[in-house]
């Protein structure tokens, strides 16, 4: 279960990075307004 926790933390970290890079891109931000507040 520890391995699963680490994998989940890594995934959420990668998702957060992807969302940040998306929200700093005007086209991606416009396509995903629900992710970018």
UniProtKB/Swiss-Prot annotation:
GO terms for molecular function: acetylcholine receptor inhibitor activity; ion channel regulator activity; toxin activity. It is found in: Secreted. InterPro entries: Conotoxin_a-typ (IPR009958). Disulfide bonds join 22-28, 23-36. GO terms for cellular component: extracellular region; host cell postsynaptic membrane. Keywords: Acetylcholine receptor inhibiting toxin, Disulfide bond, Ion channel impairing toxin, Neurotoxin, Postsynaptic neurotoxin, Secreted, Toxin. Expressed by the venom duct. Residues 24-26 are annotated as: Lacks the Ser-Xaa-Pro motif that is crucial for potent interaction with nAChR. Residues 1-21 form a propeptide. The cysteine framework is I (CC-C-C). Alpha4/7 pattern. Belongs to the conotoxin A superfamily. Alpha-conotoxins act on postsynaptic membranes, they bind to the nicotinic acetylcholine receptors (nAChR) and thus inhibit them. Has possibly a distinct nAChR binding mode from other alpha-conotoxins, due to a different three residue motif (lacks the Ser-Xaa-Pro motif). This is Alpha-conotoxin-like Lp1.9. It comes from Conus leopardus.
């Amino acid at each position: 279960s520890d391995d699963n926790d680490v994998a989940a933390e890594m995934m959420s970290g990668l998702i957060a990075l992807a969302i940040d890079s998306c929200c700093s891109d005007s086209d991606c931000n416009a396509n995903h307004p629900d992710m970018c507040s």
